[in-house]
Amino acid sequence: MIIDTTEVQAINSFSRSESSKEFYGLIWLLVPIFTPVSGILIGVLVIVWLEREISAGIQQRIGPEYAGPLGILQALADGTKLLFKEDLLPSRGDIRLFSVGPSIAVISILLSYSVIPFGYRLIIADISIGVFLWIAISSIAPIGLLMSGYGSNNKYSFSGGLRAAAQSISYEIPLTPCVLSISLRLSNSSSTVDIVEAQSKYGFCGWNLWRQPIGFIVFLISSLAECERLPFDLPEAEEELVAGYQTEYSGIKSGLFYVASYLNLLVSSLFVTVLYLGGWNLSIPYISIPELFGINKTGGVFGSTIGILITLAKAYLFLFVPITTRWTLPRMRMDQLLNLGWKFLLPIALGNLLLTTSSQLLSF
């Protein structure tokens, strides 16, 4: 039997080309998945570094300076330390709830990034109910915290989980009318892309911040409470509950709560940017990014990069508010926190929604 070497070489080259196609196809499948996740995690590292540097400046002390230039890798070093720590489990707790709770908290917050536009059409899911999908998804996170508190079989953890659930319900409700005021009157849409586009004509003069100042204040307070930042960190009050629902956690599970806290803070800042600060627009009246740089509105690498930079710049500038608030205001009592949400913010938010809808009816 005579073997044709030409045919063998052709078969080998064909198999190699098919293998390379499968390999590159797998890479292109994973790139859209890992790119947003990597960007989000880098954003969290920047937030941690900013908070430590700003906190050090407020307290007149030296912040992190040894891990990398200016201590920017300190958060990465802390995460690596938690990754290699022993993962302890409570002997009398519910192990399934104890293990699933942190994952639910992180996943629900990560899903919120799918409706955040970083540029023109630079969004994972541009759907007509984008902002309300975010509100619905973010309400899942307290369920994970409650599961963590209950599964720990610890009175401090369970009290922290109950506080987290009560706080989330109390401040989700005032936050919703603020979003409705923008969707019904100012943009006539619940799509986050449409909301940004509605603010683009007059630059910073067209921001919803000026057209909805009452809603902005209520949204700001409610978002801080949703992030459990001081003065709203009742679920983790160290003086009362040790560490709240995190008391029994160690290792990577403790790190997941740590990451979830900063992920939620970044989500809130990005939604403030999208809803009230004009999103990716340059904020100069009558000047748009495509016209300024002579590029197509639908994007391109340069236009998308400019949009991402503007969005992140606004979000990180806004982060100074929650970071400085942490070192300025004392922690509230639980009754004060609930009274603020139900008796103060909710009536104001509903009144603002009533005024907004009334002005829309009178304009017809």
Curated annotation (Swiss-Prot):
Catalysis performed (reactions): a plastoquinone + NADH + (n+1) H(+)(in) = a plastoquinol + NAD(+) + n H(+)(out); a plastoquinone + NADPH + (n+1) H(+)(in) = a plastoquinol + NADP(+) + n H(+)(out)
Bilayer topology: Multi-pass membrane protein
InterPro entries: NADH_UbQ_OxRdtase_su1/FPO (IPR001694), NADH_UbQ_OxRdtase_su1_CS (IPR018086)
CC annotations in GO: chloroplast thylakoid membrane
Keywords: Chloroplast, Membrane, NAD, NADP, Plastid, Plastoquinone, Quinone, Thylakoid, Translocase, Transmembrane, Transmembrane helix
Membrane-spanning residues: 27-47, 98-118, 127-147, 255-275, 301-321, 337-357
GO annotation (BP), single: photosynthesis, light reaction
One Pfam match: NADHdh
Listed GO MF terms: NADH dehydrogenase activity; oxidoreductase activity, acting on NAD(P)H, quinone or similar compound as acceptor; quinone binding
Alphabetical list of NCBIfam families matching this protein: PRK06076.1-2 (NF004741)
Subunit structure: NDH is composed of at least 16 different subunits, 5 of which are encoded in the nucleus.
Protein family membership: Belongs to the complex I subunit 1 family.
Function field: NDH shuttles electrons from NAD(P)H:plastoquinone, via FMN and iron-sulfur (Fe-S) centers, to quinones in the photosynthetic chain and possibly in a chloroplast respiratory chain. The immediate electron acceptor for the enzyme in this species is believed to be plastoquinone. Couples the redox reaction to proton translocation, and thus conserves the redox energy in a proton gradient.
Name of the protein in question: NAD(P)H-quinone oxidoreductase subunit 1, chloroplastic
Species, as recorded: Illicium oligandrum
